[in-house]
């Protein structure tokens, strides 16, 4: 397969059908809505036929939905964090269903009632939290004054005044000494800490100003005592009130936990509101008149019939006008999105292409060409039966036992497929978690290893370079093929066939001199390489207005041969990573084997599991990254440009469920 062929779909219908149309299109996940008001040559007809369309204020409705979504998320988090721990939180189990089913099973009245109940509990909880905080602060303050055995308010009179406050501990002794000079004043130290000393003093009203002057000099901070009883009495009351608050919180936590069943309902509703937000966000892209709406978008031509069938199910044929058009050259150049469609085995590898750059609409999709090489390279770098089996079983069981988000589905399938070459290369290298396979079983001789990572290093190195050479030749072939498709035959020779000729010529020379000892191969290879080099030198001369510039350009192009040497060297990492991963695993096995029997079968078991898991993670990561690098630099660089715009259909967020346009 390749880049999917797109068609421009136009929908015209009565304005009253807007919501049902948008919901149906969204459930299909197959139509990208065009912005008909974007300034573009492709939209010039809009101003001609719809000079004064109705303008839609989507922000107001989006704000309402955002407010509701915030309330839902707040309610879910509140139940999760404050509900009784013993009560199981019932989350929505991911499954596949249609958008129509999602909307039909929603009740605004039931949702509002449940949300109001939870938000009321939240309000009560927050009130208790505030009261508890106040009581805890009060308790901490009273603890510092609990040795004060009288109530300051009760002691105040016309003749005397009782004041409490704090002084920095460094100034406490000096403060006490100076206050002692006032005969009619009484100062008592109530409490102390390493930094602060707590005082209470009684002074005659006549000496109040003098006392305040001394207190000010020593940084005395006056405290307000707001209670009627003594600190000790008030402390007992605060502790009692605090315990009552804790009891109320415990009861309220149980009530919150009883709402755990609401979580799945709230998640269901959140999915609906997220879908509605997506629909609302594109309403300013479509044309509204007092009576009609006009929607235009891009649809995969293979899903065109699905769209037609869907519209026939929701509206009578006379209620909707539907047309499909091929994109114009201008639309192809500026607007048409790219959607990849490949065989189910190849499709997971599309994410590697997407990470690099999507192809332009009329460009070749490199995924099917890249996939076989990535399989071989990844398997060669992992090359362990045990790691491959774990990958396969893990990915397979994950897909069978759990409904995964679509992105994770593709990722799991990706590693399930990659497990196969990892196992195959594991047999070739005879490696099972770093241990060698037995030479025979039940008297039957086994041919493993086919290649030994200790004795056949040079063979593996040569094989790595050969695989790289094959991939480079394929890349050059694709480059030539793409030029031929555009009828650029000279460029096909210059950028593809000529370089293939040079590389094949060098191969023939090496075969003739080093392996076959046949001069015919040497002469044939030399002739092919020279002829190809001449093509690379001469073609720019004919393409350039200046012959000198053409020769210089040709010479520079031919100098690019040195880059191919670097490319081939890059493929030696296939050998290096494959050998290193197996060697590290074998070293871990040897480390545990050297342990005494008691330790080997206790701590050793845990140790080998941890070490093998670490090595497996690093091996898979290295194979993933270096495999991708070989595709991006050495392979894509020969023929692929990229720069396409991703196909973004009107669809649901799928935060909690997978939406399938087929009714379940």
Curated annotation (Swiss-Prot):
InterPro entries: V-ATPase_116kDa_su (IPR002490). One of its GO terms (molecular function) is proton-transporting ATPase activity, rotational mechanism. Belongs to the V-ATPase 116 kDa subunit family. It is a multi-pass membrane protein. The keyword Nucleotide-binding does not apply. Keywords: Cell membrane, Ion transport, Membrane, Sodium, Sodium transport, Transmembrane, Transmembrane helix, Transport. The chain crosses the membrane at residues 373-393, 460-480, 496-516, 522-542, 574-594, 601-621. This is V-type sodium ATPase subunit I. Involved in ATP-driven sodium extrusion. Its main location: membrane. The keyword Transmembrane helix applies. GO terms for cellular component: plasma membrane; proton-transporting V-type ATPase, V0 domain; vacuolar proton-transporting V-type ATPase complex. One of its GO terms (biological process) is sodium ion transport. It is found in: Cell membrane. It comes from the Bacteria. The gene is ntpI.
């Amino acid at each position: 397969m390749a880049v999917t062929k797109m068609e421009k779909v136009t929908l015209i219908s009565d304005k009253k059908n807007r919501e049902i149309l948008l919901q149906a299109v969204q459930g299909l996940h197959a139509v990208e809505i065009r912005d008909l008001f974007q300034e573009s040559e492709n939209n010039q007809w809009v101003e001609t036929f719809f000079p004064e369309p109705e303008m839609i204020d989507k922000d107001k409705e989006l704000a309402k939905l955002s407010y509701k979504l915030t309330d839902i998320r707040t309610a879910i988090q509140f139940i999760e964090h404050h509900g009784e721990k013993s009560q199981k939180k019932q989350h929505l189990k991911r499954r596949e269903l249609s958008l129509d089913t999602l909307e039909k099973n929603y009740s605004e009245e039931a949702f509002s009632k449940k949300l109001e109940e939870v938000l009321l509990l939240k309000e009560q909880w927050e009130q208790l939290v505030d009261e508890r905080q106040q009581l805890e602060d009060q308790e901490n303050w009273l603890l510092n004054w609990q040795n004060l055995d009288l109530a300051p308010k009760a002691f105040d009179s016309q003749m005397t005044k009782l004041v409490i406050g704090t002084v920095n501990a460094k100034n406490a002794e000096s403060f006490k000494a100076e206050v002692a000079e006032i005969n009619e004043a009484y100062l008592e130290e109530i409490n102390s800490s390493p930094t602060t000393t707590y005082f209470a003093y009684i002074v005659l009203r006549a000496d109040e100003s003098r006392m305040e002057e001394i207190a000010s000099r020593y940084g005395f901070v006056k405290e307000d005592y707001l209670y009627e009883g003594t600190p000790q009495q008030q402390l007992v009351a605060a502790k009692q009130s605090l315990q009552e608050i804790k009891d109320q919180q415990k009861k309220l936590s149980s009530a919150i936990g009883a709402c755990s069943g609401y979580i799945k309902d709230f998640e269901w509703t959140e999915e609906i509101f997220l879908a509605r937000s997506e629909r609302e966000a594109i309403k300013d892209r479509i044309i509204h008149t007092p009576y009609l709406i006009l929607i235009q978008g891009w649809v995969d031509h293979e899903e065109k019939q699905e769209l037609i069938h869907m519209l026939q199910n929701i509206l009578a044929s006379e209620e909707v006008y539907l047309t499909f058009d091929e994109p114009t050259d201008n639309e192809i150049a500026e607007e048409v999105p790219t959607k990849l469609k490949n065989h189910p085995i190849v499709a997971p590898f599309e994410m590697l292409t997407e990470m690099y750059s999507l192809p332009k609409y009329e460009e070749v999709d490199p995924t099917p060409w890249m996939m076989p090489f990535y399989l071989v390279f990844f398997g060669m770098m992992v090359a362990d039966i045990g790691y491959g089996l774990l990958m396969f079983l893990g990915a397979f069981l994950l897909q069978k036992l759990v409904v995964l988000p679509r992105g994770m589905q593709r990722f799991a399938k990706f590693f399930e497929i990659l497990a196969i070459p990892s196992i195959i290369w594991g047999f070739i290298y005879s490696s099972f978690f770093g241990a060698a396979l037995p030479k025979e079983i039940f008297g039957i001789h086994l041919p493993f290893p086919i290649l030994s990572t200790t004795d056949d290093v040079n063979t593996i190195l040569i094989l790595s370079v050969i695989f790289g050479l094959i991939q480079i030749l394929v890349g050059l072939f694709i480059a030539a093929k793409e030029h031929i498709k555009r009828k650029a035959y000279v460029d096909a020779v210059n950028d593809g066939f000529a370089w293939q000729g040079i590389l094949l010529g060098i191969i023939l020379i090496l075969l003739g001199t080093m392996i076959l000892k046949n001069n015919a191969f040497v002469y044939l290879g030399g002739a092919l390489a020279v002829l190809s080099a001449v093509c690379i030198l001469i073609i720019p001369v004919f393409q350039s207005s200046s012959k000198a510039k053409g020769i210089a350009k040709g010479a520079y192009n031919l100098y690019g041969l040195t880059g191919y040497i670097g490319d081939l060297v890059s493929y030696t990492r296939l050998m290096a990573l494959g050998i290193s991963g197996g060697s590290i695993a074998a070293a871990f096995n040897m480390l545990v084997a050297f342990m005494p029997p008691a330790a080997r079968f206790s701590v050793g078991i845990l140790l080998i599991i941890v070490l093998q898991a670490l090595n497996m993670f690093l091996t898979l990561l290295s194979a993933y990254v270096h495999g991708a690098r070989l595709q991006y630099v050495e392979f894509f660089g020969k023929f692929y440009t990229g720069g396409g715009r991703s196909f973004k259909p009107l669809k649901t967020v799928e935060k909690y469920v997978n939406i399938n346009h087929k009714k379940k």
